[in-house]
């Protein structure tokens, strides 16, 4: 809450986060993928069913898009990993109004890359757009096979 009593326009509430392990796994296995020199982004539409054929029960239709961040231990010590998380979350928070809605995004850094705000900020929105297009094209291919 801001001092004026209204909600902050650019926030990152828990409802905007991918938190369950099954949601991460689903996005990593079935989502569209895009990468650049420092980040890998996976995008998966909210309405993709689980293995049992049902959409996730707790996914709200009011959520525009959600972010999950996964930082492998090979990335560095806790200080380095937490810096990556902060920078990726900030890039999402500042650009969430520009991102396609209805998707879960899972982001991870590439190995042996130093966290640089300019690189993350510049590439984040572009990678999300590319991952969404790939996710949609793979969904189109799988629907024609059925």
Swiss-Prot record:
Relate the protein's function as given in its record.
Answer: RNaseP catalyzes the removal of the 5'-leader sequence from pre-tRNA to produce the mature 5'-terminus. It can also cleave other RNA substrates such as 4.5S RNA. The protein component plays an auxiliary but essential role in vivo by binding to the 5'-leader sequence and broadening the substrate specificity of the ribozyme.
The UniProt family comment states:
Belongs to the RnpA family.
Alphabetically ordered keywords of this record: Endonuclease, Hydrolase, Nuclease, RNA-binding, tRNA processing
Query: In the UniProt record, does the keyword Nucleotide-binding occur?
Result: no
Q: State the oligomer form and interacting partners.
A: Consists of a catalytic RNA component (M1 or rnpB) and a protein subunit.
Q: Which GO terms describe its molecular function?
A: 3'-tRNA processing endoribonuclease activity; ribonuclease P activity; tRNA binding
Q: Does the keyword Transcription apply?
A: no
Q: Sorted alphabetically, which Pfam families does this protein's record hold?
A: Ribonuclease_P
Q: What GO biological process term is on the record, naming one?
A: tRNA 5'-leader removal
**Listed name of the protein:** Ribonuclease P protein component
- EC number(s) stated in the UniProt entry for this protein: 3.1.26.5
Task: Name the reaction it catalyses.
Answer: Endonucleolytic cleavage of RNA, removing 5'-extranucleotides from tRNA precursor
Q: Which GO terms describe its cellular component?
A: ribonuclease P complex
Q: What class of enzyme is it?
A: hydrolase
Gene3D superfamilies per the UniProt record, alphabetical: 3.30.230.10
InterPro entries with a match to the protein in the record: Ribosomal_Su5_D2-typ_SF (IPR020568), Ribsml_uS5_D2-typ_fold_subgr (IPR014721), RNase_P (IPR000100)
């Amino acid at each position: 809450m801001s001092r004026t009593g209204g909600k902050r326009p650019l926030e990152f509430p828990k409802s905007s986060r991918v938190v369950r392990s099954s949601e991460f796994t689903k996005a990593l296995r079935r989502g569209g993928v895009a990468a650049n020199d420092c980040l890998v982004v996976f995008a998966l539409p909210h309405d993709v069913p689980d293995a049992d054929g049902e959409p996730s029960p707790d996914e709200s239709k009011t959520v525009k898009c959600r972010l999950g961040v996964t930082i492998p231990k090979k990335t560095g010590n806790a200080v380095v990993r937490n810096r990556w998380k902060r920078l990726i979350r900030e890039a999402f928070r500042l650009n969430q109004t520009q991102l396609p809605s209805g998707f879960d995004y899972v982001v991870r850094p590439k190995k042996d890359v130093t966290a640089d705000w300019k690189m993350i900020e510049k590439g984040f929105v572009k990678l999300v757009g590319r991952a969404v297009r790939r996710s949609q094209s793979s969904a189109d291919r799988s629907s024609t096979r059925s």
